Swiss-Prot record:
<keyword id="KW-0238">DNA-binding</keyword>
<dbReference type="GO" id="GO:0003677">
    <property type="term" value="F:DNA binding"/>
</dbReference>
<dbReference type="InterPro" id="IPR015300">
    <property type="entry name" value="DNA-bd_pseudobarrel_sf"/>
</dbReference>
<dbReference type="InterPro" id="IPR005508">
    <property type="entry name" value="At2g31720-like"/>
</dbReference>
<feature type="DNA-binding region" description="TF-B3">
    <location>
        <begin position="126"/>
        <end position="230"/>
    </location>
</feature>
<protein>
    <recommendedName>
        <fullName>B3 domain-containing protein At1g20600</fullName>
    </recommendedName>
</protein>
<dbReference type="GO" id="GO:0005634">
    <property type="term" value="C:nucleus"/>
</dbReference>
<keyword id="KW-0539">Nucleus</keyword>
<keyword id="KW-0805">Transcription regulation</keyword>
<feature type="compositionally biased region" description="Basic and acidic residues">
    <location>
        <begin position="64"/>
        <end position="73"/>
    </location>
</feature>
<dbReference type="InterPro" id="IPR003340">
    <property type="entry name" value="B3_DNA-bd"/>
</dbReference>
<keyword id="KW-0804">Transcription</keyword>
<feature type="region of interest" description="Disordered">
    <location>
        <begin position="53"/>
        <end position="79"/>
    </location>
</feature>
Length: 237
């Protein structure tokens, strides 16, 4: 092999030139691979950005739904019997059971034959359970003060002090009896059923808005507990 001057070149110089060219080619290939890897990393970052934005958007929507749900929860007012519910939250079977339960009532006049007692028990105390009634940290069923004053307190014995607590028998949906206490908390301001209520909730799996309790007439037994010392729970779920 000859150079530009026409003189032959040594094999050593030729080998060095070939080695240099190969080294340059290898470096160029390595540089190109690094560029491709960098582009892939950028693509991954770009691709993950929409996912991150979607995730953040979902989190914001979830927080908005939680805030909306909290706003829609019923406020605690004096009449604990009041609760706003959405009829679409219930299945057709549950709605049918609720309707049947409300309609299946005996005529109190046929039972008592007394106008005054009939007036007091024309409708028993009924309550749709609220979240505070089934929360594990509450351990009580809140009752309507107005209804308790009209339909329960007048029928207590003189020896029965609701402030200290009155023993009551509570009937479950299956007819089983559990002993609890009816009390007036905060002096005589807040009527509650306690001392065993949460166990009752757990035993029958009672849920807010889906289950009801009643004191007074138990239509299935064709009987009325006129002293307010017995309570029955009707599970509609």
């Amino acid at each position: 092999m000859a150079n530009s001057t026409g003189k032959p070149t040594s094999s050593t110089q030729e080998d060095e030139e070939v080695t240099y060219i190969l080294a340059q080619l290898m470096q160029d290939v390595m540089d190109r691979e690094e560029d491709i890897d960098d582009e892939d990393d950028i693509d991954d970052e770009v691709a993950s950005l929409p996912l991150l934005l979607v995730s953040q958007a979902n989190q914001k929507q979830s927080r908005k739904r939680e805030e909306k749900t909290e706003k829609n929860q019923p406020k605690r007012v004096k009449n604990q019997n009041i609760m706003k519910i959405n009829i679409h939250d219930f299945s057709e079977e549950t709605l049918r059971l609720i309707e049947d339960w409300y309609n299946a009532e005996l005529d109190p006049q046929d039972i008592f034959g007394d106008d005054e007692v009939t007036r007091r028990f024309s409708r028993p105390i009924k309550k749709q359970l609220m979240s505070s009634d089934v929360d594990t940290d509450q351990s009580r069923l809140m009752l309507s003060k107005e209804q308790v004053k009209e339909k329960m307190l007048p029928f207590l014995e003189e020896s029965e002090d609701p402030v200290k607590g009155v023993d009551v028998s509570v009937y479950g949906p299956d007819g089983e009896v559990q002993q609890m206490k009816f009390k007036m908390w905060n002096g005589d301001k807040t009527p509650v059923l306690t001392s065993g209520w949460m166990q009752f909730v757990a035993d029958y799996g009672l849920l807010k808005t889906s289950d009801f309790v009643t004191d007074g007439k138990v239509s299935q037994l064709e009987h009325v507990f006129i002293r307010g010392s017995k309570v029955r729970c009707c599970n509609t779920s």
